[in-house]
Amino acid sequence: MIPRNFFFTILICPFNVCATFTAVATASPDCIGPFASYALFAFVTCICVCSIVCLVINFFQLVDWIFVRIAYLRHHPEYRNQNVAALLRLI
């Protein structure tokens, strides 16, 4: 079973981006000054970049987990350690 933290972090990143874009969409450009608009743009850019980085890291962790599971299951059954498998959530 795939650990739940992969799903949570995958869902949190798009949620943050959508919430940020929603907040920006309700901001009126006539009401804010130039500094505030640049600060808002920087905030949106940081949120998007951090979310993309988080998704990439999470993807690499998921791929690593899959390869560890495949390597563990390819071992002969007498060499499989159930404690290690439970710790890594491989079974």
Swiss-Prot record:
A GO CC annotation given for this chain: host cell endoplasmic reticulum membrane
InterPro entries recorded: Adeno_E3B (IPR005041)
Lumenal side: 23-34
Chain ranges on the Cytoplasmic side, renumbered to this chain: 61-91
Location in the cell: Host endoplasmic reticulum membrane
Keyword vocabulary terms for this entry: Early protein, Host endoplasmic reticulum, Host membrane, Membrane, Signal, Transmembrane, Transmembrane helix
Membrane-topology descriptor: Single-pass type I membrane protein
Name of a matching Pfam family: Adeno_E3B
Primary localization: host cell
Domain of life according to the entry: Viruses
Residue spans crossing the bilayer: 35-60
Extent of the signal sequence: 1-22
Sequence similarity: Belongs to the adenoviridae E3B family.
Function: Down-regulates the EGF receptor.
Protein name listed in UniProt: Early E3B 10.4 kDa protein
Species name: Human adenovirus B serotype 3
